[in-house]
């Protein structure tokens, strides 16, 4: 069964460009949001992040950019109500359908001209009370780590060679490298001495009572970790009968930051409560409440 704009149909009876994934996509991936779990899961659903911050909202389009001006973002509906993918507990998802063709505009009008993403959350199942818990622990690593030149003598030698190669030795070296780092032949000689003899002091005070630093510091390694971790805990309770049913879930997600200095942490709390009560044979009362709190602290 596939969820479409006007209800549900069997996959064999489906007409139109619609793709759907079920809860397995989200149960196998530990991510702070649905959008990150959907990356690469549905054809022609393009999801990009400006950076790696866990709080960063995704840019979503279907089948490429649809508008030069507005960008052509897809309409996101969560249980029939327009919402934000970043605030939904991934473990609450029953299915996600993507409407890609013009039929979405016929149902939702101009707002659905660039496609529609239909998110259906889990509902209660009749029967005895069922309690479910799942948790995960994940390690995150950077895909690319820049290899920086940390040796001052090696860096300055490369700069001198590049300068002389460009000007063919016709122009003298500037007193400031890139208008930031001062240069002098005496400093260059001191860097050469410390490159060959690491036992020499890395910090000294000159005749003007100023500090001079000759340390070789890998600032990328000093500020950023090679790995950071996250852990997630989910619990849900559901049950009911033909007259009343309920589904209540809670989630705690905690991700450590990548900075070595400062207290960087991302925490997300989710609570969802769904219930149905049959008041009369012809009257049913439904409730669907979602509550999300995000606590994100970064040192800068």
Stretches with model-predicted labels:
Residues 297-300:
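Outer-membrane beta-barrel translocator/channel fold
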Residues 289:
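Cationic-aromatic interfacial patches
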């Amino acid at each position: 069964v596939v969820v479409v704009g006007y209800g549900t149909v069997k996959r064999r009876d489906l007409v139109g460009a619609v793709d759907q994934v079920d809860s397995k996509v989200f149960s196998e991936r530990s991510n702070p949001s649905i959008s990150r779990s959907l990356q690469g899961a549905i054809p022609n659903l393009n999801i990009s992040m400006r950076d790696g911050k866990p709080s960063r909202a995704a840019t979503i389009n279907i089948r490429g950019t649809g508008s030069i001006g507005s960008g052509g973002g897809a309409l996101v509906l969560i249980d029939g109500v327009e919402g934000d993918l970043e605030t939904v507990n991934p473990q609450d998802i029953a299915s996600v359908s993507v409407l890609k063709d013009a039929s979405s505009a016929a149902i939702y009008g101009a707002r659905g001209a660039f496609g529609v993403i239909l998110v259906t959350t889990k509902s209660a199942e009749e029967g005895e009370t069922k309690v479910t818990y799942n948790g995960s622990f994940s390690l995150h690593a950077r895909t690319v780590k820049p290899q920086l030149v940390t040796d001052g003598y090696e860096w300055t030698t490369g700069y001198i060679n590049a300068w002389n190669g460009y000007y063919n030795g016709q122009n003298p070296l500037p007193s400031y490298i890139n208008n930031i780092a001062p240069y002098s032949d005496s400093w260059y000689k001191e860097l050469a001495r410390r490159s060959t003899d690491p036992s020499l002091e890395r910090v000294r005070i000159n005749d003007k009572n100023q500090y001079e630093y000759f340390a070789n510091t890998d600032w990328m390694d000093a500020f950023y970790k090679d790995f950071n971790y996250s852990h997630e805990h989910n619990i849900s309770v559901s049950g009911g009968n033909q007259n009343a049913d309920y589904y209540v879930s809670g989630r705690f997600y905690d991700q450590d930051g990548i900075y070595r200095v400062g207290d960087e942490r991302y925490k997300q709390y989710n609570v969802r409560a769904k219930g149905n009560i049959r008041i009369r044979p012809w009257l049913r009362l439904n409730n669907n409440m979602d509550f999300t709190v995000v606590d994100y602290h970064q040192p800068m």
